[in-house]
Regions:
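Predominantly extracellular beta-rich ligand-binding scaffolds that present long acidic/polar faces
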Residues: 1-224
Length: 224
């Protein structure tokens, strides 16, 4: 882990994060992280952390909006290795982008991640809603954007073992169009306490499930 400029581990947000004006990068744990002042690559590692609070942006205007349960916007210059690594994290909070601009990205874990994103062994069961449609490319539906306009800006991102509760993510505020996930799997709320719903999650040393903890959803043993 020596190469990382920012390491977040065993952290949690349980409160409400709200912004209502200006240029927004909003997340439960990280709002924005990018190049350092000298223009060199930064490396981000977020592990065994979670959000259970509401993360919300309410605004109108032309400013861009990036909102995610764990991080709003993680970006860097082009690099030859994964510079954003998110592992064993989850979101159970609502992610709400009540905006009227045309550039916005909302995701259960990350709103927007630029270049090489490695995300694995994560899940989201929180409601993800965005009000307007916006443009994006190299979209990574599922965990890197439960709303369809969450995105990564590089096609070689590594997304593995990602799960989202069915019915929590929609294409617009009117809840008319459910999101199609390309890199991830749905699980039904009725199966939230079934370890088989979470693929190869490590339930021996990292994750556990108990009916009286975390609403019956998987929780982190070292960060309950």
């Amino acid at each position: 882990e020596g190469k990382y400029s920012l390491i977040i581990e065993y952290c949690a947000n349980k409160g409400t994060v709200n912004a209502s004006a200006g240029f927004h990068h909003i997340g439960g744990l990280v709002g924005y992280f990018g190049e350092n002042s000298s223009g060199y690559d930064n490396y981000v590692y977020i592990k065994e952390s979670y959000n259970s609070g509401t993360v919300e942006v309410t605004q109108s205007g032309a400013n861009s909006t990036y909102v995610g349960g764990i991080a709003g916007h993680l970006e860097d210059s082009n690099t030859s290795s994964w510079n954003v690594h998110i592992k064993n994290c989850y979101n159970r909070g609502s992610v709400l982008a009540r905006t009227s601009n045309e550039t916005y990205h909302a995701g259960g874990i990350v709103g927007k991640a630029s270049y090489y994103l490695a995300m694995e062994y994560c899940y989201s069961s929180g409601r993800v809603r965005s009000q307007e449609e916006g443009g994006s490319y190299y979209r990574a539906p599922g965990m890197a954007g439960c709303h369809a306009d969450g995105e990564t800006l590089f096609p070689d991102s590594r997304l593995n073992q990602l799960f989202i509760e069915e019915g929590t993510a929609w294409d617009d505020w009117n809840e008319s169009l459910p999101v199609i996930i390309d890199w991830g799997s749905y699980f039904d709320a009725a199966d939230k306490s079934d370890k088989r719903s979470y693929g190869s999650f490590d339930f021996n040393s990292i994750w556990d499930i108990k009916s009286d903890i975390n609403g019956g959803y998987p929780y982190l043993r070292n960060n309950p």
